[in-house]
Amino acid sequence: MGNWGVGISQSDTYCETYERFIEEYDKGKPVSQITQDILAEWLEEFEEDDGVLHDVFFALGKAEWLCGGISESIFNRINEIIKNGKDIAYWQELSATPSDLKQRQKALQTFLNSISTSKATAKKEKFPRITILQNQVHHSYLCQK
């Protein structure tokens, strides 16, 4: 997995996690179940304090916030990662430049501020559309688009 910028969403891990969350949400799966399933998969591969998981928690936090409200456990974990400097320390291990670290810290604070306020409306699920097609023999088929 890689990062291509200092922004919160500028990593493969973040994008993969966020997209998976939204796909499951759009299928009607409960937010808490999606979060639990995604975390379980990542925790099979990485230790809970591994820096790779920071982007997983950030993506889950953003997705939960967007879909109606961030859970207390995810918010507290994100807050801990940011306030205790864990993400910046992880980026230092990755040999980030001082300029990148400063920009990352600013991005982290902006992100934390944004998820700290409640969102007025939750994202609506986008269920797959179903259309009925008829062939020449007048049999009906259901198709998902």
Which stretches of residues belong to each language-model region?
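Short terminal alpha-helical segments
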Residues: 1-42
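Amphipathic alpha-helical elements of HEAT/ARM-like alpha-solenoid repeat scaffolds that form extended
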Residues: 2, 16-17, 51-66, 98, ...
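Charge-rich, solvent-exposed alpha-helical interaction surfaces
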Residues: 20, 34-41, 77, 81, ...
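Amphipathic alpha-helical interaction modules
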Residues: 32-72
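Long protein-protein interaction modules used by eukaryotic assembly/scaffold proteins
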Residues: 61-75, 79-92
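Amphipathic alpha-helical binding modules
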Residues: 80-132
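Structural motif
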Residues: 131-139
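Short beta-strand-centered aromatic/proline hotspots
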Residues: 141-145
